[in-house]
Amino acid sequence: MIIGIGNDLCNIERIQRSLDRFGERFEQRVFTPHEIAKARGRRRVAETYAKRFAAKEAMAKALGTGVPRAGVHWKHLGVINLPSGKPGFELTGGAAARLAKLTPPGHRAVVHLTLTDDHPWAEAQVIIEAIPVAEPS
């Protein structure tokens, strides 16, 4: 069953302006060390950050909280890449607690994330699915 859905559209040029104006202060406030390292290692830094910013917003919407609200902060919503390259989340703090609260007993949460960009836009969609946990036989 679907227990949350969210999407967000982020202007890449707005992220670039934030980087130009606030630099490391902006990075440190919004992104995890892993996300910062990933973005700085890429040729298209603003696009990388914009997709992750959109993902954080989309996840916060799927959690039903917005950000920063209800104990969910930017850095609690870590965007990662699985070994396959597929994007995903590493939730901590208030975000992990909120997801646990949303997940029905006897279920586990699975988060689906997709990211795309087409200058000047970056977009993210999140679906949170609750899957029944198989009982041992």
UniProtKB/Swiss-Prot annotation:
A GO term for molecular function: holo-[acyl-carrier-protein] synthase activity
Class in the EC hierarchy, top level: transferase
List of residues binding Mg(2+): D8, E57
Subcellular location as annotated: Cytoplasm
A Pfam family hit: ACPS
Keyword line: Cytoplasm, Fatty acid biosynthesis, Fatty acid metabolism, Lipid biosynthesis, Lipid metabolism, Magnesium, Metal-binding, Transferase
Cofactor: Mg(2+)
Cellular-component GO terms for this entry: cytoplasm
E.C. code: 2.7.8.7
Source taxon at top rank: Bacteria
SS bonds (residue pairs): none
An example Gene Ontology biological process: fatty acid biosynthetic process
Predominant localisation class: cytoplasm
Matching InterPro entries: 4-PPantetheinyl_Trfase_dom (IPR008278), 4-PPantetheinyl_Trfase_dom_sf (IPR037143), ACPS (IPR002582), Ppantetheine-prot_Trfase_dom (IPR004568)
Reaction catalyzed: apo-[ACP] + CoA = holo-[ACP] + adenosine 3',5'-bisphosphate + H(+)
Family: Belongs to the P-Pant transferase superfamily. AcpS family.
Family annotation (NCBIfam families): acpS, pantethn_trn
Function, as annotated: Transfers the 4'-phosphopantetheine moiety from coenzyme A to a Ser of acyl-carrier-protein.
Protein name as it appears in the record: Holo-[acyl-carrier-protein] synthase
Taxonomic placement: Bacteria, Pseudomonadati, Pseudomonadota, Alphaproteobacteria, Hyphomonadales
Gene (UniProt): acpS
